[in-house]
UniProtKB/Swiss-Prot annotation:
Localization (cell): Cell inner membrane
Pathway: Cell wall biogenesis; peptidoglycan biosynthesis
Membrane-related topology note: Multi-pass membrane protein
GO biological process, one term: cell division
Function: Catalyzes the initial step of the lipid cycle reactions in the biosynthesis of the cell wall peptidoglycan: transfers peptidoglycan precursor phospho-MurNAc-pentapeptide from UDP-MurNAc-pentapeptide onto the lipid carrier undecaprenyl phosphate, yielding undecaprenyl-pyrophosphoryl-MurNAc-pentapeptide, known as lipid I.
GO cellular component: plasma membrane
Protein name: Phospho-N-acetylmuramoyl-pentapeptide-transferase
Family membership: Belongs to the glycosyltransferase 4 family. MraY subfamily.
Cofactor(s) of this protein: Mg(2+)
Length: 368
């Protein structure tokens, strides 16, 4: 909204210096600062409110260190969503389809997560929202994003095709399969971030690193000169995603102020599902979905550990009559907790791994 207001003021009065409003880098920085200020100013008030209403229940099977985390409020994802949405609406071109698709994804899955958290911590319903209803919400969002982009002729030509990472000469045309692909990616990534949200700061920090790389990809994809030089698909409007991405990064960093160990608040499913859907939708819109195993590497590894654990347990139970486990506990971060690693050490090492994976994904820009 501020973009349109300041553009109008510039058109009428032409004050010096206001031309910076046309620069994506300026608005991305402004969006980041705005999101961070919102978190730091309103965060304590939101935490005080949540502390009286919604205390996170601790699972009996959780590691010993985790069971000490009592009387800590959840639903902190509300402050993340507030910061991103307000900042995005202020600084991005809200008329761009990419902008409202990302903002919609965050609100949509944030609402699904909110219902789940509310049922668990307020209504005391064990398990919260049924898994099938979460899947319905994820599939519906994927269908909206995939369907809109596929049937919009101006977007379909660009988004239904992609290049293979490390081999840019090979182009894949998804065709109608772009819609089920969008559904799968939205569902998989939002669940992956949800699984990763088990240690103080792990999901927020990993998301900040992941989305920061997506911000870079979005900026390059939306700039015709850079896209041509790097031999990547130029997508008009993708640059606006940079602004939202930086708002997400700043919101996650601001949330770490309160969520770093020892945490004062948890993001809950409200935050993890919202952030996961944002990562998925941004990757889809800027054609980096095939790079997600690197860009969202920690989330991918955490999910893989759960799949391997459950699959091996079922296989050995069927084969031997007794289920066996590969990891001491899944997701993987709990395995290291069981081994006696300090929570801060696990989180920081996972962040380092995520940085290395993101840097690897950035190498694809120069590979022909």
């Amino acid at each position: 909204m501020l973009y349109y207001l300041l553009s109008y003021v510039r058109e009428i009065y032409d004050p010096p210096g206001l031309g910076v409003i046309n620069y994506i880098t300026f608005r991305a920085g402004a969006a980041a600062v705005t999101a961070l200020i919102i978190i730091l100013v309103f965060g304590p008030k939101i935490i005080r409110f949540l502390r009286d209403k919604v205390i996170e229940p601790i699972k009996e099977e959780a590691p010993e260190e985790h069971r000490k985390k009592v009387n800590i409020p959840t639903m902190g994802g509300l402050m993340i969503i507030l910061a991103i949405e307000v900042s995005g609406l202020l600084w991005a071109k809200i008329a761009e389809p990419f902008v409202w698709m990302v903002l919609l994804a965050i609100i949509w899955m944030g609402a699904v997560g909110f219902v789940d958290d509310y049922r668990k911590v307020v209504l005391k319903i064990k398990g919260g929202l049924s898994g099938r209803y979460k899947i319905v919400g994820q599939v519906a969002l994927g269908l909206i994003i995939g369907g809109y982009t596929f049937f919009d002729p101006t977007l379909s030509v660009l988004l239904s095709k992609t290049t293979v990472p490390f081999i840019k000469e090979i182009t894949v045309d998804y065709g109608i399969w772009y819609i089920p692909l969008a559904i799968f990616i939205v569902t998989a990534v939002s669940n992956a971030v949800n699984l990763t949200d088990g240690l103080d700061g792990l999901a927020a920090g990993s998301t900040a690193i992941s989305v920061f790389s997506l911000a870079g990809f979005a900026y390059l994809t939306g700039n015709v000169k850079f896209a041509e030089y790097l031999n990547i698909t130029y997508i008009p409007g993708a640059g606006e995603v940079t602004i939202l991405s930086m708002a997400i990064v700043a919101a996650c960093i601001g949330f770490l102020w309160f969520n770093s160990n020892p945490a004062e608040v948890f993001m809950g499913d409200t935050g993890s599902l919202a952030l996961g859907s944002a990562v998925a939708v941004i990757a889809l819109l800027i054609k980096k979905e095939l790079l997600l195993p690197l860009i969202a590497g920690i989330f991918f590894i955490e999910t893989l550990s759960v799949i391997i654990q459950r699959g091996y347990f079922k296989y050995t139970k069927r084969r031997d009559g007794e289920g066996k486990r590969i990891f001491r506990m899944a997701p993987l971060h709990h395995h290291f907790q069981k081994k006696g690693w300090a929570e801060q050490k696990i989180v920081i090492r996972f962040w380092i791994i995520e940085v290395l994976l993101v840097l690897t994904s950035l190498l694809t820009l120069k590979l022909r």
